[in-house]
C-alpha cells in the first residue's frame, strides 16, 4: 500500500472541491483510494505526462485532473494538484 501525501495547494483545492463540486469530490475520493493500491492503473485514464517528468495525471471530470508523483522507494504518492487541467496557466 502506498502512503498518500498532499501539497498545500492540493489540500486547499480538495477543500474547495468538497464544498462546491460534490460529484467531482466523490470521484476524487475513489481515485485516491485506488492510488493507495495501484498508482499506475485504474479509473480516470492514468497517464504519465510528457512534458512534466515523473508526473502522472488522472481525469476527474471534463475540466479537472489530479496530478501526482510516485516514489516507489518510499512507497509514497504525492498529490500535486486536484483542480484544473495541467495545461491551464
Language-model features, listed with the residues they occupy:
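Enriched for short, Lys/Arg-rich terminal
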Residues: 1-3, 15-26, 30, 59-89
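A short, surface-exposed loop/turn module that caps and links secondary-structure elements
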Residues: 33-59
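Generic alpha-helical hydrophobic packing signal
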Residues: 2-5, 36
Amino acid at each position: 500500500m502506498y502512503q498518500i501525501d498532499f501539497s498545500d495547494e492540493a489540500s486547499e483545492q480538495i477543500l474547495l472541491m468538497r464544498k462546491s463540486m460534490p460529484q467531482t469530490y466523490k470521484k476524487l475520493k475513489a481515485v485516491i483510494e485506488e492510488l493507495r493500491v495501484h498508482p499506475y492503473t485504474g479509473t480516470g485514464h492514468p497517464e504519465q505526462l510528457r512534458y512534466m517528468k515523473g508526473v502522472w495525471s488522472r481525469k476527474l471530470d471534463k475540466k479537472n485532473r489530479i496530478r501526482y508523483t510516485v516514489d516507489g522507494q518510499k512507497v509514497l504518492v504525492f498529490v500535486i494538484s486536484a483542480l484544473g487541467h495541467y495545461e491551464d496557466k
